[in-house]
Regions:
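Conserved nucleotide-sugar donor-binding catalytic segment
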Residues: 141-223
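Short aromatic/hydrophobic "clamp" motif used to bind/position activated sugar donors
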Residues: 88
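Short, acidic, metal-binding catalytic loop of nucleotide-sugar glycosyltransferases
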Residues: 24-33
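Cell-envelope/extracellular polymer assembly enzymes that use nucleotide-activated donors
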Residues: 4-7, 35, 181
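Conserved donor NDP-sugar-binding/catalytic core segment of glycosyltransferases
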Residues: 100-132
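N-proximal low-complexity "stem/linker" segments adjacent to membrane-targeting elements
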Residues: 1-25
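A conserved acidic beta->alpha catalytic loop
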Residues: 40-49, 68, 92
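Glycine-rich, basic loop-to-helix element that forms the pyrophosphate-binding segment
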Residues: 66-83
Length: 261
């Protein structure tokens, strides 16, 4: 039986200190039918050059480079156009995968044929790879989408891209909202599930993109953001003011709320 191809999408920018660890963790995967697509976003610290060297001898690793820095969201948009897999997974260039990450994910998808998106638990590691803490993800609840967001390790069936907007070009000027925006597009329409195993090592080095994101209430682009739209709908918030929608009871409504004797 043909084994599905998994596309690991890696946007890289000035991570020369960590990208070797990331690529090595892909090479060590127990599941072998994957492609790692690296798109360097104009690094000036040698990240692209090192990735080129590390890709030699392994045709599964494909290294590309933007002519100029275009930002994380636009880079992820380009990466999705290069991928050929049956499944897509986001893999940051400063992080690492547990060696059985892809295999475990595919086993879960096999057991859950109707599920389109699966996310795992992860461990946060420091600059030198030391484990700082474990981060269990919440169990997925489609009625509480505002309690969810992109979680590592996240993998989804590539055919969902035919039914959603995809990477949001309107967020091109932001630095790291592509993952959350895409996540909400998927889970708004399709079933998702949590795999309660630590499959991903998220590196905290003080310069992470996710720590620089504007909060939704302060983001000038939230009206164009699927994450904010779905979050507000689920949490019963007004996306314009980013405040809870007040419920005004009429006289009959108030009477119905009074305790019965």
């Amino acid at each position: 039986m043909t084994k599905p191809l998994v596309s690991l999408l890696m946007a890289a920018y000035n991570n020369v200190a960590y990208i070797k660890n990331a690529i090595d963790s892909a090479k060590k995967q127990t599941y072998k039918n994957w492609e790692l697509i690296i798109l360097d976003d104009g690094s000036d610290d040698g990240t692209w050059e090192l990735a080129e060297v590390l890709s030699k001898g392994d045709k599964r690793i494909k290294v590309h480079k933007n002519g100029v820095n275009i930002g994380y969201n636009s880079t992820m948009l380009k990466l999705s156009g290069l991928a050929k897999g049956d499944f897509y997974a986001h893999f940051d260039s400063d992080d690492m995968l547990e060696r059985y990450a892809i295999e475990e994910m595919l086993l879960a998808f096999e057991q859950l044929p109707d599920v389109k998106f699966i996310y795992s638990d992860f461990a946060q590691i420091g600059k030198k790879g030391e484990v700082e803490h474990y981060s269990p993800s919440p169990t997925f609840d489609p009625n509480k989408l505002h309690q969810h967001g992109w979680r590592h390790f996240g993998m989804y069936r590539s055919d969902v891209m035919e039914h959603i907007q995809g990477y949001n070009e309107k967020l091109a000027s932001t630095n790291g909202c592509a993952d959350g925006d895409l996540f909400m597009q998927i889970v708004e329409k399709f079933p998702a599930a949590r795999l309660p195993k630590v499959l991903y090592l998220y590196r905290n080095h003080g310069n992470n993109i996710s720590t620089k994101n504007a909060k939704c209430e302060a983001c000038p682009l939230r009206m164009d953001c699927n994450f904010a739209r779905v979050w507000c709908k689920s949490a019963n918030y007004d996306i314009t003011t980013f405040k809870p929608i007040e419920v005004h009871h009429g006289i009959e409504d108030i009477r119905s709320l009074e305790p019965k004797n």
